[in-house]
Amino acid sequence: MTSSKPKKTSRVRKTTKNSKKNIPLTMPPLAKTPPSFKNKVVDKKALKNLVSWAYKTHGTAITAAMADNLKDLGFKYATQAAVSISVDDLKVPAAKQDLIGQAEEQISATEECYRLGEITEVERHTKVIDTWTETNERLVDAVKDNFNQNDPLNSVWMMANSGARGNMSQVRQLVGMRGLMANPQGEIIDLPIRTNFREGLTVTEYVISSYGARKGLVDTALRTADSGYLTRRLVDVAQDVIVREEDCGTERSIVVEAEDGKFGARLLGRLTAEDILDSEEKLIIPQNTAIDPALSGKIETASITKVKIRSPLTCEANRSVCRRCYGWALAHNHLVDLGEAVGIIAAQSIGEPGTQLTMRTFHTGGVSTAESGVVRSKISGRVEFSSKAKVRGYRTPHGVEAKQAEVDFILKIVPQGNNSNKSQKVEVSSGSLLFVDDGEEISSDITVAQIIAGAVKKSVEKATKDVVCDLAGQVKYDKVIQPKEVTDRQGNITLKAQRLGRLWVLAGDVYNLPPNARPVVSSGKSVVEGTVLAEASQSSEFGGQVRLRESVGDSREVQIVTTSMSLNNFKLIEESTHSGQIYNLESSDGTLYRLNTAPGSKVSNGQVIADLTDERFRTKTGGLVKYSPGLSVKKARSSKNGFEVSQGGTLLWIPQETHEINKDISLLMTEDMKWIEAGTEVVKDIFSQTSGIVTVTQKNDILREITVRNGTFHECDDEEVLNRFTEEGNLVNPGEKILDGIDNKEILFVQKLETSKGRGLLLRTVEEFNIPDQAQLPNLSHVKQEKGPHLGLKAIQRLTYKDGELIKSVDGVELLRTHLSIESFNATPQMTIDVESMEDENDASINRLNLVILESILVRRDTMSDSSHGSTHTELQVKNNTLVKAGDVIATTQILCKEKGLVQLPNVVEDDPIRRLIVEREEDKIKIKISNKAVVKVGDRVVDGDPISGSEKAISCGEIEEVSSSSVTLRIGRPYMVSPDSVLHVEDGDLVLRGDGLALLVFERQKTGDIVQGLPRIEELLEARRPRDSAILCNKSGVVQIKQGNDEESVSLSVIEKDDLVNEYQLLPGKNIMVSDGQQVTGGEVLTDGPINPHELLDCYFSDIRDQKPLIDAARESISKLQRSLVNEVQNVYKSQGVAIDDKHIEVIVRQMTSKVRIEDAGDTTLLPGELIELRQVEDTNQAMAITGGAPAEFTPVLLGITKASLNTDSFISAASFQETTRVLTEAAIEGKSDWLRGLKENVIIGRLIPAGTGFSGFVEELASEAGPHPDILAEESGGYRRAQNLRPDYTVDMPQSPAVSSTAILDDPSDEDLETTRNRHGIDPSSSNFAAFARPSAENQFSEDQLPDPAALEGLQEEGLLSDE
């Protein structure tokens, strides 16, 4: 049926012919390839390729069916073959025992070298770890060979080998060995797990392996959370990147370089940016062609190493990416569709594999040198170096003495004698290690050299390791070490070894002496068991009377009473109460003191020990305190302890009874201001104790307090009299006139009152208390030593209340307290004051109180011998109750010898105490009988196997002490190798015990360059974090100049730039220089080791290029350099974990991070300094300035981390829904921002259809591009254009007309047939429906296809010079 109706077209998938190159951009029809027959083993990889091929050539449905058939096939044959896994399938290779045996031999040889002091502790550790690592790898090979040759159909082997499940590292643990494990600090334990899971682990191995297992689990848990958050940030930064244009028409591109002549998948699906020509200038691939695998192969065949391709990084589409710059959509391997949300796809592609990345890495604890480039001899013969060879001595990390080549040369192995073999040539590069000498005869299969490829400057860091002593004895240095004193900035002096050499410890029994002991034997004296080696004495400081106490624990206490004081005229009386014992002191005149501290307790200086019980200062009720003028008190820090009286006088007391209550007012049984007698009931159940006037305080009908003030009330209306007195009250002296008819003979307290009867004066009586200047002290008797401390008692009077204080109380209070406190002078801290109860000398029934100052001396018990102190014997030199003088010896402790031997004292500076001595015993020496003349002399140091005479060899390490004609005496010792620059903790001749630190080895290990690996590294890159201790980067290109300072440490580094400007760089300590003198460097190159700060890198690139190019080009070029390095860094992390991600995804994210610049100087534009703005916008503004002749804006490119970039997007709705909601929304409100709803997120939040996929409308973009050169303004013009509403493509909508527009444009007119089917599908009657989508626009509305925009809007644009008048 031929139809004349308009065809329905879709704007999204349109076949646009490119006039120049004529390439259709839609999917080509699926190719039908002829069947081909392949006969080979299909493993996981082959399956992958098969499914992928099927998908590309035959489409989804066929591929799904094929995959299903493959699955059935797999199950069928697995069932037929009865494949299963049982314990018997885990076959341990027979070679395992030999391999482990070899490793153990190597390691015991290494341990022996270490024992003989031939290698350092670090070298031993490194060698052990490397040996096990190598063994493990060889074992994996053995496992593979064993399965391949003996049991190729083993189910475990098939499973791991085909890629169905598991990998070699797991199979290795099942049937090889579990291998080395790391401890919780991440250092490798040098004890590997030699067994596998088939043989079973020992308990120790199980515990060691559990470290790693726990680490793995914790890691996984943390990883999922981190990875999820990374994905969220990525989605946020890239969600508005949608393919919105066909071709942005850019001329910029990026260069992809081949690795080893291969491009791999890096070119697939990209469009060429220019014609690709081969070496003969023939066109292979025209510009703008999508590269498929065939074309990629063609490029490689033509040996082209660099290809320029289009990339999202250089796409000039506004706020989006165009189809040609993006290339293929990897879902179907055809050019990406318009409206594809490539930003979200990129974010998910980078975020999803995050869980597969590891979080942290292990340190190896030493340089793990993998045996790289090892050359072994193939024939036996003589080694010959070529004439230009230059070598120097070198010590490998394993402590092997080797040679290092200084230049490139050729080494030959020439066969000797009638050997017909060809000679073997080895090309030696500079820096390689040689294990043979020139002219040396070697056999075949010997390690000849380790070739180092290229002069790679590795970044190294300093690490340290302690050397701990294994036996007690005396330290001796080898002369080679040449220790030198180094003073650091703080003035601390350390000893450092200058050369590689040995530190010896010669055996002996070392005794630790107590602090005050001194040796009583001289050096070189022979001693036997029980000889006294040293003596320590303990003496009294002040002297006094000795008291011996019972022993406590392993020591005995001797107390010396230096000062005592007894209270003679007081009896000590003990009372028992239910709360415990109470002690009182009673004098003959009846004065009573209450004791605060029980006898037997210790007290300190200034402490109150007793209070005077004195009823004279006790009142009957509460009241008001007034001090008379003579009475004065010391200022107290706090009134808690009262106020100490400094001068006696009279204390005045005005009694007043206060009942504090909380009851209803209805219970009140008296009236306010009424006179009552003592014993009256004022409130139910509360009686007054005194007569006087009642004052009632109430609040909200609740009684608070009732006061009864004693005295007499006199009515008075005389204003003059009343004004003399206040309501608070005044004191009136005796004889002073108050009112007519009142004769006052004592002090009165007068208050003005208003009562219900009228006004008047209340005259209150005043009680007087006399306070003496000094409190009475009890009678004391002293016993004191000449030099000893003084002890005394002091009586203190304290007033409880301050002047004018009102005490609210019903019961009486104590106004004055007298305390007895202790005073002592010249007492040392170890002295204590004891309170004791003593019987009276004359009357045993009376107890007296005694205060004594004791000097306490702890005397050691006798001990049997222990490892470091020897046995001790202590004697007391005093008896109980005897008197001693100051400085008398109380006890002596002797240190006794444990075994027979010779004493040696260490060398000490005069007056320094000797803290250790050594006894050289018989068992520390070995006598070796000799038949020939000895070849060693006294003082020589030998190790096992060194010759002593013509035929005898040393059987132990040590120092020769005696040489006679028939024998040699050797003192056993232990050598420790120390490397240059090690810090020595001991000096020559020092005595050390087992476990003491001897030295701190300082060694260099390769900086594990990617300690920050996996996820944290990805996060560091994408968040553009500034690393700590970052590398120093070269600012502008030039030539390096390195100068050595005065001392070894200081080096100055500078770069001479092109105008002979010298730029000096500040070097921090511990930084290694990565460039050499005279080297040519460019901006952004690393000068020292350390992580690179991406912000600094961008600045260096920019400042370097800015000198040669205009601003906009410099910004573009520096940004593109940084983009490349960021993309590569991110790729490296994923590649190292075996994750493949297409470059274009990372490029989309990096594009978002580098799209902004910071305005430095606004020129004549409307921009603000410090503003972050898109580079494209600044470019447009500056172009406009160039036309009008205004000053352009100056700017510098910036790099934003993904979080920062998300918060800096144009859309405030998107930014607010991400982080810092309040801040973003407040700023948007203040600045009056509009959100144009360009991204997905904004539309989802508002609830519209998202502008991607079918909701993407290309109409606005097309109209804008037809309208003129500035798409941005048109796109943002809200009136004037009808936005294509986001509807499904098979409906259209009749929009309400915009008042400024006379008519409207309609998209995608459906045909009548389409409308009919839709109506039927929804059951709509056409006549009754006024629903916009189903009403056909009538012809009267005169729609025309070529709609003109709003004329007013056009005029506005022309005035701004953004549209031409045409």
Swiss-Prot record:
Q: What is one Pfam family matched by this protein?
A: RNA_pol_Rpb1_3
Q: Record keywords: Nucleotidyltransferase included?
A: yes
Its quaternary structure?
A: In cyanobacteria the RNAP catalytic core is composed of 2 alpha, 1 beta, 1 beta', 1 gamma and 1 omega subunit. When a sigma factor is associated with the core the holoenzyme is formed, which can initiate transcription.
| Stated name of the protein | DNA-directed RNA polymerase subunit beta'
Q: Which CDD domains match?
A: RNAP_beta'_C
What are the BP-aspect GO terms?
A: DNA-templated transcription
Q: Where is Zn(2+) annotated to bind?
A: 248, 315, 322, 325
Kindly list the cofactors needed: Zn(2+)
